[in-house]
């Protein structure tokens, strides 16, 4: 249970770059060793993280293209492979579909969040700064 919580925090750490710019903390090369440390196999975490990084290396959001989520795919692919004792190639085979599914859920959430701007507009009309801040924090 503790490992699952720590892996969730590792994923949150990977997504913190959305709020502070783009230091590329969400890359499998960064998160793989952290996942390996959490699960007790840093060496395998480095190997799997590097393998996944090669796949996700060119995955950048340009225009309307949203690439597979390297953070979720990297963390979960590395974790599943380490726990199951699988190779880096098998981790890649798991990480790609996980990353694509995560991106699909992300698109759904962003669509829902676009509707909350109307609520923020209402709060702005009322002069409710705390309401606006709450909506912006939620998004």
Residue ranges of predicted features:
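Hydrophobic transmembrane alpha-helices
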Residues: 1-72
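Transmembrane helix-bundle signature of multi-pass membrane transporters/permeases
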Residues: 8-12, 34, 79, 95-103, ...
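Generic secondary-structure signature for well-ordered alpha-helical cores
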Residues: 11-18, 44, 81, 85, ...
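Long, highly hydrophobic alpha-helical transmembrane signal-anchor segments
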Residues: 56-100
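Helix-loop-helix junctions within the multi-pass membrane cores of secondary transporters/permeases
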Residues: 93-139
């Amino acid at each position: 249970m503790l490992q699952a919580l720590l892996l969730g925090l590792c994923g949150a750490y990977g997504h913190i770059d959305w709020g502070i710019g783009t230091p590329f903390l969400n890359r499998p090369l960064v998160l793989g060793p952290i996942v390996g440390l959490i699960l007790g196999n840093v060496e395998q975490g480095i190997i799997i993280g590097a393998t996944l990084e090669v796949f996700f290396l060119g995955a950048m959001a340009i225009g309307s293209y949203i690439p597979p989520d390297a953070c979720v795919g990297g963390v979960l692919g590395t974790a599943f492979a380490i726990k199951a004792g699988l190779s880096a190639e098998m981790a890649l085979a798991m990480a790609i579909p996980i990353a694509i599914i995560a991106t699909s859920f992300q698109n759904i959430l962003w669509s829902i969040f676009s509707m909350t701007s109307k609520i923020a507009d209402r709060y702005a009309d009322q002069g409710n700064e705390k309401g606006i801040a709450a909506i912006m924090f939620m998004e």
